[in-house]
Amino acid sequence: MIENPSPSAANLPEHPSTDASHPRNIRSFVRRTGRTTVGQAKAFADVGPRFLLAYKAEPLDFAAAFGRVAPTILEIGFGMGEATAHIAALSPDKNFLCCEVHTPGVGALLKRIQEQTLGNIRILQHDAVEVIDNMLPAGSLDGVHIFFPDPWHKKKHNKRRLIQAPLIAKLAARLKPGGYLHCATDWQPYAEQILEVLSAEALLKNTADASGGGYAPKPDYRPLTKFENRGIKLGHGVWDVVFTRV
């Protein structure tokens, strides 16, 4: 299941509509440009063969991929991998399956893995929705992290947002009973949509009480990234939404 793809995003598909009325067209990303650094390219060569998994339209063998059986957390869109590496270091007893299509971000996380000697992360450089559909069996996950997905601020672009009912239904089905789904955003209108969508999913239950408006306190495991700290200093809010599988 392991490959070392070339650190190039040239062949990534464009972002189609993610309108909830067309669930087959949901994608977890939009195309972005960016260059890998020398250090990131070196990490691809040095540790990519071990930590990058090949996408295949068949159920993933978690034990083979990670070399052990352990609770598995899916992360969708890890950016430059800062929070991912922090959480993985705090939880060596858990496996982290991380999806990101943007090559500089993948290279950055590989570099962190190498520098911090993290053995519990595996990366799929592929659209997360196809990974969920074709590689993750029902009841296979212990948790899901979706931190700061693109908010698509303009109303006409809201339909492109990742967190919509079709995707949440897929994720809920793949969580084990008692597993959790944790979303975080710094855009209040998106936070409201996330809360509404997750609340409407029958297989999920909110962990927060009404006193917080349905939003959860920031879990200790999620670090404040440089980006988030910058936003807080500018007076921006951050909303965490944490639901569990019933």
Curated annotation (Swiss-Prot):
<feature type="binding site">
    <location>
        <position position="127"/>
    </location>
    <ligand>
        <name>S-adenosyl-L-methionine</name>
    </ligand>
</feature>
<comment type="function">
    <text>Catalyzes the formation of N(7)-methylguanine at position 46 (m7G46) in tRNA.</text>
</comment>
<feature type="binding site">
    <location>
        <position position="150"/>
    </location>
    <ligand>
        <name>S-adenosyl-L-methionine</name>
    </ligand>
</feature>
<feature type="region of interest" description="Interaction with RNA">
    <location>
        <begin position="156"/>
        <end position="161"/>
    </location>
</feature>
<feature type="binding site">
    <location>
        <position position="100"/>
    </location>
    <ligand>
        <name>S-adenosyl-L-methionine</name>
    </ligand>
</feature>
<keyword id="KW-0808">Transferase</keyword>
<keyword id="KW-0949">S-adenosyl-L-methionine</keyword>
<comment type="pathway">
    <text>tRNA modification; N(7)-methylguanine-tRNA biosynthesis.</text>
</comment>
<keyword id="KW-0489">Methyltransferase</keyword>
<feature type="binding site">
    <location>
        <begin position="225"/>
        <end position="228"/>
    </location>
    <ligand>
        <name>substrate</name>
    </ligand>
</feature>
<keyword id="KW-0819">tRNA processing</keyword>
<feature type="binding site">
    <location>
        <position position="186"/>
    </location>
    <ligand>
        <name>substrate</name>
    </ligand>
</feature>
<dbReference type="InterPro" id="IPR055361">
    <property type="entry name" value="tRNA_methyltr_TrmB_bact"/>
</dbReference>
<comment type="similarity">
    <text>Belongs to the class I-like SAM-binding methyltransferase superfamily. TrmB family.</text>
</comment>
<dbReference type="GO" id="GO:0008176">
    <property type="term" value="F:tRNA (guanine(46)-N7)-methyltransferase activity"/>
</dbReference>
<protein>
    <recommendedName>
        <fullName>tRNA (guanine-N(7)-)-methyltransferase</fullName>
        <ecNumber>2.1.1.33</ecNumber>
    </recommendedName>
</protein>
<dbReference type="Pfam" id="PF02390">
    <property type="entry name" value="Methyltransf_4"/>
</dbReference>
<feature type="binding site">
    <location>
        <position position="75"/>
    </location>
    <ligand>
        <name>S-adenosyl-L-methionine</name>
    </ligand>
</feature>
<dbReference type="InterPro" id="IPR029063">
    <property type="entry name" value="SAM-dependent_MTases_sf"/>
</dbReference>
<feature type="binding site">
    <location>
        <position position="154"/>
    </location>
    <ligand>
        <name>substrate</name>
    </ligand>
</feature>
<dbReference type="GO" id="GO:0043527">
    <property type="term" value="C:tRNA methyltransferase complex"/>
</dbReference>
<dbReference type="InterPro" id="IPR003358">
    <property type="entry name" value="tRNA_(Gua-N-7)_MeTrfase_Trmb"/>
</dbReference>
<feature type="region of interest" description="Disordered">
    <location>
        <begin position="1"/>
        <end position="26"/>
    </location>
</feature>
<feature type="active site">
    <location>
        <position position="150"/>
    </location>
</feature>
